[in-house]
Design a protein with these regions (language model features):
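Short beta->alpha connector loops
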Residues: 116-119, 140-145, 264-265
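Short beta-strand segments enriched in small/hydrophobic residues
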Residues: 28, 33-38, 72-88, 188, ...
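Short hydrophobic/charged patches on amphipathic alpha-helices used for structural packing
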Residues: 69, 123-126, 149, 186, ...
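Amphipathic helical "hinge" segments at domain boundaries
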Residues: 63-128, 132-136, 213-217
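N-terminal helix-turn-helix DNA-binding module of bacterial transcription factors
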Residues: 1-78
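Short catalytic-loop micro-motif centered on adjacent basic/acidic residues
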Residues: 111-113, 138-139, 199, 303
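Bacterial carbohydrate/catabolite-sensing allosteric modules
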Residues: 1-15, 60, 101-106, 154-161, ...
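Acidic, Gly/Pro-rich loop/turn segments at junctions of secondary structure
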Residues: 136-149, 161-170
Length: 351
């Protein structure tokens, strides 16, 4: 068996299991609990010699103040929960970071969790966070029925939904104008001469995907253009599925001359498919993504601001925690069309 040598740092040895308490500090310094409390909280009324003994005891024991107990006495835990679809998704990274920054400004700790687009997992995470007495929640919903949250809202847990609306629950909501953004993106392709335009997106049961499909259909109707069902492909975002649908649409006797993609993951796969074609196909994607401006051609996108989604959702959450009592609010953020080249290509067959 290997021998473990002392670290030689001069610091107190690690103490696993029970943490030192104020009572331990008081016993070592030979003072009362109230005296330790005054030193820990920076209150007056302690002599320099006594304060030195208390601080020496704190250092020797490795004592840390229990902030959880302190904030609980104020009626809050000083923590908020964030439940996302997937923490690894590039779209959610700036959203999560923005929520964390606002929480930090308000002296709160953020606890993250991923639902993996699974309603059961979402509910499990949310209720686990509530059981740990978080002050509030920011949720990107995976499910369509959020009545399970009614007791938590009634108990005072502030809750803001972001990116997608909750189901069967009146609550604050911050989302992007997916319908308007998709409509403008497809209209941009129409303005550059395209008449056969396909859409590839996420599962139609997801609110954002459904709204972007609705925007696509509205833009086609605005231009009095037909929509063949073979031009519409919504489903999971697995590269195999997306690549198969993209290949099908851009080949054959009457291929589409342009594609509108419903999110950044779909766009990346479609870019790979189009790079293998002998002819150009115009492309506009919903969501910007890293290096989109460096591709050939650079990818035209309908950009949203996930950082602002997170900031606005967190700001609304802390307004509620500070006592704002107005009815549930719905905040819709605009999108921005970013022309870069791929969306400005003319139809290859000159129609």
């Amino acid at each position: 068996m290997a021998e473990i040598a002392p670290s030689g740092t001069g610091l107190p040895a690690p103490r696993y299991g029970g943490r030192p308490t104020m009572k331990d500090v008081a016993a070592r310094a030979e003072v009362g609990l109230k005296t330790v409390s005054r030193v820990v909280n920076g209150e007056p009324g302690v002599s320099p010699d006594t304060e030195r003994r208390v601080r020496d005891a704190i250092t020797a024991l490795g004592f840390r103040r229990n902030d959880s107990a302190r904030v609980l006495r104020k009626g809050r835990t000083g923590s908020v929960g964030l439940v996302l679809e997937d923490l690894a998704d590039p779209f959610y990274a700036p959203l999560s970071r923005a929520v964390e920054e606002v929480a930090r400004i308000h002296g709160a700790l953020l606890i993250n969790g991923s639902s993996a687009e699974d309603p059961a997992r979402e509910r499990e995470l949310v209720l686990a966070l509530c059981a740990r007495r978080v002050d509030g929640l920011v949720i990107v919903p995976a499910g369509e029925d959020h009545r399970y949250l009614e007791p938590e809202l009634a108990a005072g847990v502030a809750t803001v939904f972001v990116d997608r609306p909750p189901g069967s629950l009146a609550a604050d909501l911050v989302l992007t104008d997916s319908f308007g953004g998709a409509r403008s993106g497809v209209a941009h392709l129409v303005a550059h001469g395209h008449r056969r335009i396909g859409i590839i997106g996420d599962h139609p049961g997801i609110h954002t995907a459904a709204e972007r499909l609705r925007g696509y259909r509205a833009a086609m109707a605005d231009a009095e253009l037909p929509v063949r069902e073979s031009w519409v492909a919504l489903g999971d975002t697995a590269p195999e599925r997306v690549a198969a649908d993209a290949t099908r649409m851009v080949t054959g006797e009457r291929p589409v001359t342009a594609l509108f993609t419903g999110n950044n993951r779909v766009t990346v796969t479609v870019v790979r498919v189009l790079a293998q074609l002998a002819r150009p196909v115009a492309l506009v994607g919903f969501d910007d993504f890293e290096l989109a401006d460096l591709l050939s051609p650079p990818v035209t996108v309908v950009a949203q601001d996930p950082g602002r989604l997170g900031r606005d959702a967190a700001a609304l959450l802390f307004r509620r925690l500070d006592g704002a009592g107005e009815p549930p609010r719905r905040v819709t953020l605009p999108t921005r069309l970013v022309p870069r080249g791929s969306g400005e290509l003319p139809p290859y067959d000159g129609e």
